[in-house]
Amino acid sequence: MLLALAQWLQGDASFLRLFTYLTFRAVMATITALGIGLVCGPWVIRKLTQMKVGQAVRKDGPQSHLVKSGTPTMGGVLILIGIAVATLLWGDLTNRFIWIVMLVTFGFGVIGWVDDYRKVVYKDPRGMSSREKYFWQSVIGLFAAVYLAFSVSEANNVRVFDLFMAWVRSGLSMGLPARADLMLPFLKSISYPLGVWGFIVLTYFVIVGASNAVNLTDGLDGLVIMPVVLVGGSLGVFAYVMGSSVYSKYLLFPHIPGAGELLIFCSAMGGAGLAFLWYNTHPAQVFMGDVGALALGGALGTVAVIVRQEIVLFIMGGIFVAETLSVMLQVSWFKYTKKRYGEGRRLLKMAPLHHHFELSGWKETQVVVRFWIITLMLCLFGLSTLKLR
């Protein structure tokens, strides 16, 4: 919004040229989202408390968590407000990637809000049924996947629908340009062509998978938000590189016109996340709930797809991956042993993984900070793929 205003008034005031610089707008988006979160945080927490949207704690979880029962949840709305205002103020609103990321983020946020609402109203820690939640995630994920298959391929925003129709007329067999290939980290001249169907399937699983992985990780005070900020910031760097014809050429990456604007979104997400951490750090005054976790995970997955860094997201989001795998392995092993031996057995003391470490003697703050450190190391490793190719 401010970019369009600055471009309109630039002839009358040359200092407004500053607003056209992507890096300046990214910094301002961070400050704006951070300021909104810090200022509005107490009001949001107070309103959530008045609405009696207290967290229902699992009775089969660690006993130390029982004291958290009643802590306001659905605090993810504070993050989404900061992201929305900062992105709309400082982003280029003609950019197609900004809008698709916002659509996925807030679409998944609505799903999470409904899930949280059911948990609060019916006092059921499980919320929406897995089938219902997965259905709506799939609707949004598939829509985004189909759109991105052609918008990433098209250098300009004017022929996306034409490209889609050309694919239909080709009998759904048309390929995609090299910029839509799956990039392999550390290999500068090798990529895997996906085709339209491959792109759609991969994108769907990345977006939906990232959303659920972040949601599973959200189980301790401050645990998930810092990894989201770190991974989001790292993806913002990739977006800046991919969106620049100069840097992408120098670093031997495909140039994706318009992708650089995602730096604004990632910066807003970082600022909003840090503001939320102010109130979510141990002992938490508010929990983000599914409204925040599902939205942020979907956002990370969508940005990673646009900048063609799905594998790097897998690396940098290693904590999210480990948490998800711990649940999958725990459930699978329990079902297998119950069928084989007549009683279910567990691989871990409890899943997700952070609860296993809690029950192994780690304090909650130890688990959180150590997971942060691991994520920082993984993000630095992921960023190294920019040059080590």
From Swiss-Prot:
<feature type="transmembrane region" description="Helical">
    <location>
        <begin position="311"/>
        <end position="331"/>
    </location>
</feature>
<feature type="transmembrane region" description="Helical">
    <location>
        <begin position="286"/>
        <end position="306"/>
    </location>
</feature>
<keyword id="KW-0573">Peptidoglycan synthesis</keyword>
<feature type="transmembrane region" description="Helical">
    <location>
        <begin position="222"/>
        <end position="242"/>
    </location>
</feature>
<dbReference type="GO" id="GO:0005886">
    <property type="term" value="C:plasma membrane"/>
</dbReference>
<keyword id="KW-0460">Magnesium</keyword>
<feature type="transmembrane region" description="Helical">
    <location>
        <begin position="25"/>
        <end position="45"/>
    </location>
</feature>
<comment type="function">
    <text>Catalyzes the initial step of the lipid cycle reactions in the biosynthesis of the cell wall peptidoglycan: transfers peptidoglycan precursor phospho-MurNAc-pentapeptide from UDP-MurNAc-pentapeptide onto the lipid carrier undecaprenyl phosphate, yielding undecaprenyl-pyrophosphoryl-MurNAc-pentapeptide, known as lipid I.</text>
</comment>
<dbReference type="GO" id="GO:0046872">
    <property type="term" value="F:metal ion binding"/>
</dbReference>
<dbReference type="GO" id="GO:0008963">
    <property type="term" value="F:phospho-N-acetylmuramoyl-pentapeptide-transferase activity"/>
</dbReference>
<keyword id="KW-0132">Cell division</keyword>
<keyword id="KW-0133">Cell shape</keyword>
<keyword id="KW-0997">Cell inner membrane</keyword>
<keyword id="KW-0808">Transferase</keyword>
<dbReference type="Pfam" id="PF00953">
    <property type="entry name" value="Glycos_transf_4"/>
</dbReference>
<feature type="transmembrane region" description="Helical">
    <location>
        <begin position="190"/>
        <end position="210"/>
    </location>
</feature>
<dbReference type="GO" id="GO:0051992">
    <property type="term" value="F:UDP-N-acetylmuramoyl-L-alanyl-D-glutamyl-meso-2,6-diaminopimelyl-D-alanyl-D-alanine:undecaprenyl-phosphate transferase activity"/>
</dbReference>
<dbReference type="GO" id="GO:0008360">
    <property type="term" value="P:regulation of cell shape"/>
</dbReference>
<feature type="transmembrane region" description="Helical">
    <location>
        <begin position="135"/>
        <end position="155"/>
    </location>
</feature>
<dbReference type="InterPro" id="IPR000715">
    <property type="entry name" value="Glycosyl_transferase_4"/>
</dbReference>
<keyword id="KW-0472">Membrane</keyword>
<comment type="similarity">
    <text>Belongs to the glycosyltransferase 4 family. MraY subfamily.</text>
</comment>
<dbReference type="InterPro" id="IPR003524">
    <property type="entry name" value="PNAcMuramoyl-5peptid_Trfase"/>
</dbReference>
<keyword id="KW-0812">Transmembrane</keyword>
<feature type="transmembrane region" description="Helical">
    <location>
        <begin position="366"/>
        <end position="386"/>
    </location>
</feature>
<protein>
    <recommendedName>
        <fullName>Phospho-N-acetylmuramoyl-pentapeptide-transferase</fullName>
        <ecNumber>2.7.8.13</ecNumber>
    </recommendedName>
</protein>
<dbReference type="Pfam" id="PF10555">
    <property type="entry name" value="MraY_sig1"/>
</dbReference>
<keyword id="KW-1003">Cell membrane</keyword>
<keyword id="KW-0131">Cell cycle</keyword>
<feature type="transmembrane region" description="Helical">
    <location>
        <begin position="73"/>
        <end position="93"/>
    </location>
</feature>
<comment type="pathway">
    <text>Cell wall biogenesis; peptidoglycan biosynthesis.</text>
</comment>
<dbReference type="GO" id="GO:0071555">
    <property type="term" value="P:cell wall organization"/>
</dbReference>
<keyword id="KW-0961">Cell wall biogenesis/degradation</keyword>
<dbReference type="GO" id="GO:0009252">
    <property type="term" value="P:peptidoglycan biosynthetic process"/>
</dbReference>
<feature type="transmembrane region" description="Helical">
    <location>
        <begin position="258"/>
        <end position="278"/>
    </location>
</feature>
<dbReference type="GO" id="GO:0051301">
    <property type="term" value="P:cell division"/>
</dbReference>
<dbReference type="InterPro" id="IPR018480">
    <property type="entry name" value="PNAcMuramoyl-5peptid_Trfase_CS"/>
</dbReference>
<feature type="transmembrane region" description="Helical">
    <location>
        <begin position="97"/>
        <end position="117"/>
    </location>
</feature>
<keyword id="KW-0479">Metal-binding</keyword>
<keyword id="KW-1133">Transmembrane helix</keyword>
